[in-house]
Amino acid sequence: MALQFTEREFIPVLLGGDINAYSVARAFYEEYQVKSLVFGKYQTGPAYRSQIIDYTPNVDIDTMPVMLKTVNGIAQAHADKTIVLVGCGDNYVALVAQAKDAHELADNIVAPYAPYSMLEQCQKKEIFYELCEKHGVPYPHTFTFTKAMLNAQGEAPAEVLDQIDFPYPMILKPSDGIMWWQHEFEGQKKAYEIADRAELEQVIRDSYASGYTDDLIL
């Protein structure tokens, strides 16, 4: 059965090519029967070749000049439409929010984001938890591992890991998700379910050896 599309007063423009972009495009289609314009870095991934998506790869789409040229060009070409601009990933959200703050987006672009300074606070996990503490919002018990805790060999000292007072398995994730993906390494994940002490030591070692410098949240 062929998909049916409806002309609307808006066009979804999504940045990213992974499952997040596909999921947002699918939500737009299911609710409004519209096709989303999606821009990702590579000609692969869940968003590529989807029937509900018009996908364009551009390896530099995550840079400010290319992103602005792309989305403002779409806005100009569809001046009678509202362009709903959505970043499908922390780096794209940050990019769009900064452009919005600087008033660099065309007038018919809607970017549904708070000021970048506020987003930055929420994206950094340890700051987010501090805000939860301040406002009485429950959150999981955490331990923050910093790069300064490493020993001279670039490893997590036993006396530091002994301070972690909750059992395995435990979840480990980077505080700065944007920086995290800028330093790729073998076995890298968005979040880890750490089974034991040996795995914890390995993930910490690999994370900082890659060039990542921000905190790890356990």
Where are these regions (language model features)?
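Short catalytic-loop micro-motif centered on adjacent basic/acidic residues
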Residues: 13-14, 84-86, 140-143, 217-218
